[in-house]
Design a protein with these regions (language model features):
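Membrane-proximal intracellular helices of multi-pass ion channels
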Residues: 1-254
């Protein structure tokens, strides 16, 4: 029961104040919720269920879950799927998990929780808009649509910016830590993504890191906590809409 309570608290804290206000205002009726709340609730449920299922399947033949009952395996899989996106608790030794499970946890960490919550990461809504933008491109649609609503193009641009900044910093930091410490890319990426997503999970290599690697992780934590758009806007000049625009021309992509 303790693990279930912890998971419930993590989910509550990861949804965001906007969602809870919307739920209370509309008395929990899903069809009356704002698009933001619908995306958060739907994608959060998808991440929790799919994440737990994949971890469970990956660890069937793994060493960490050996000797445990089916119910314990399901609970541990569910717990790690929930906690990977924000809280950073672990009921199993993450270093003993299969590489597939570790990589999945990395993906969950970088997606993170939802805007206005206690969680870090790219955020669920940002990642969904990023995916929907890709899907609309494949379908050759001029607009991004979700739950019978159209998403503004500026929101899509910001989503791509956030995802790009997180990925570039994560990859660069991973390569640096791996080169400095002589550890595998998987271990280095786990630590770096955990830092930038402000999760706190580790495979156990953090205590032995050099000062340089620790500084890299600290900078990632600061970036992840402050937010990519906040930092970007802080160092960018104020942009005024011009009265005239340059001629537009198409270029070949891909």
């Amino acid at each position: 029961y303790f693990n279930l309570i912890i998971m419930l608290l993590i989910i509550v804290g990861g949804l965001g104040f906007f969602v809870w206000n919307d739920i209370v205002t509309n008395k929990g009726r899903f069809k009356y919720l704002r698009l933001h709340s619908k995306i958060v609730l739907t994608f959060t449920a998808f991440l929790i269920i799919s994440g737990a299922l994949i971890i469970f399947l990956c660890e069937i033949k793994g060493t960490e879950f050996q000797g445990k009952s089916i119910s314990e395996k399901i609970l541990n899989s569910l717990f790690q799927s929930v906690t990977a996106r924000t809280a950073g608790f672990n009921t199993v030794n993450l270093a003993n998990l299969t590489h597939a499970s570790q990589f999945l946890i990395i993906c969950l960490m970088i997606v993170g929780g939802s805007p206005g919550s206690t969680a870090g990461g790219i955020k669920t809504t940002t990642f969904v808009v990023f995916l929907l933008s890709i899907i609309s491109t494949f379908k050759r649609k001029k607009s991004i649509e979700c739950f019978r609503r159209r998403i503004d193009d500026d929101v899509a641009k910001r989503a791509f910016t956030v995802v790009a900044m997180y990925l570039v910093l994560s990859v660069a930091a991973t390569m640096a830590v791996s080169a400095i410490e002589g550890v595998t890319l998987n271990a280095a990426m786990f630590e770096c993504v955990s830092a930038i997503a402000t999760v706190g999970l580790t495979l156990g290599i953090t205590p032995g890191l050099s000062v340089v690697s620790e500084i890299i992780l600290v900078l990632l934590m600061i970036f992840g906590r402050v937010g990519s758009l906040t930092i970007l806007f802080a160092f960018s000049a104020e942009h005024l809409s011009p009265l005239s625009r340059l001629p537009q021309e198409k270029i070949q992509i891909g």
